[in-house]
């Protein structure tokens, strides 16, 4: 019996990517690339980092959403400031080699038909925000325009109201990143239900938190849990497989 798992419904999914206005003149812009693909342009560039902010972020079945990757950008951070779960039912990609971070404190679902088309590493988290050393934060729960956040991220911040459950991540998808890259799923309960995760020569980092806390990030996007952080369950069911060797 699996208890305490946050179950999300795929019914009545609004397949929509809607930028918010928290970045002002640097707001994200969604352009139709072709009949089945949207391109996300704009955003706020700070050194090697590109920041996007959305009221809602979903990828519908049989569609693709790709982030533009400007020159010199090595990390793309995408936060959801609205109140809805992100349903990734199609292809989520990057037009370049930047690492992609998807941040939605409400929860994230990867449906059976979801896939990644990235050349870098990928991280999905229900954290409230990401810390950049002493430079500051990029927060989904207290959104503002990013200041001088030019360094690599240093920690995921879970600042939910005390005694309020941290929302989870569910995947039924085959999710892959290229050779030597890493894939991170970090939230409350992590449920991999018939999912297939492939990171040939890289790492899979799965982390579940039961309470508020800070999870540090190393220079390879690896997770560093403090001993006093209460951990939540991670479920791998219905033939879920995780492959880091490059062999099947």
Predicted segments, located by residue:
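Extracellular and secretory-pathway beta-repeat/beta-biased strand scaffolds
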Residues: 1-248
């Amino acid at each position: 019996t699996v208890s305490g798992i946050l179950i999300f419904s795929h019914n009545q999914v609004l397949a929509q990517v809607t930028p918010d206005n928290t970045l002002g003149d640097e707001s994200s812009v969604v352009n139709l690339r072709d009949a089945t693909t949207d391109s996300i342009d704009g955003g706020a560039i700070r050194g090697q980092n590109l920041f996007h902010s959305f009221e809602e972020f979903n990828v519908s079945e049989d569609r693709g959403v790709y982030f533009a990757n400007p020159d010199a950008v090595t990390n793309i951070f995408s936060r959801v400031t609205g109140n809805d779960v992100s349903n990734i039912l199609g292809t989520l990609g990057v037009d370049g080699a930047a690492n992609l971070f998807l941040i939605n404190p409400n929860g994230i679902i990867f449906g059976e038909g979801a896939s990644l088309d990235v050349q870098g590493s990928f991280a999905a988290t229900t954290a409230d925000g990401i810390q950049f050393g002493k430079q500051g934060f990029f927060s989904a729960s207290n959104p503002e325009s990013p200041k001088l956040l030019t360094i690599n991220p240093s920690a995921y911040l879970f600042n939910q109201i005390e005694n309020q459950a941290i929302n989870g991540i569910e995947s039924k998808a085959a999710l892959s990143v290229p050779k030597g890259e890493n894939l991170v799923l970090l939230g409350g309960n992590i449920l991999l239900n018939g999912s297939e995760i492939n990171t040939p020569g890289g790492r899979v980092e799965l982390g579940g938190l039961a309470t508020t806390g800070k999870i540090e990030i190393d220079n390879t996007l690896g997770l560093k849990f403090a001993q006093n952080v209460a951990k939540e369950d991670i479920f791998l069911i219905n033939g879920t497989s995780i492959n880091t060797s490059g062999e099947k």
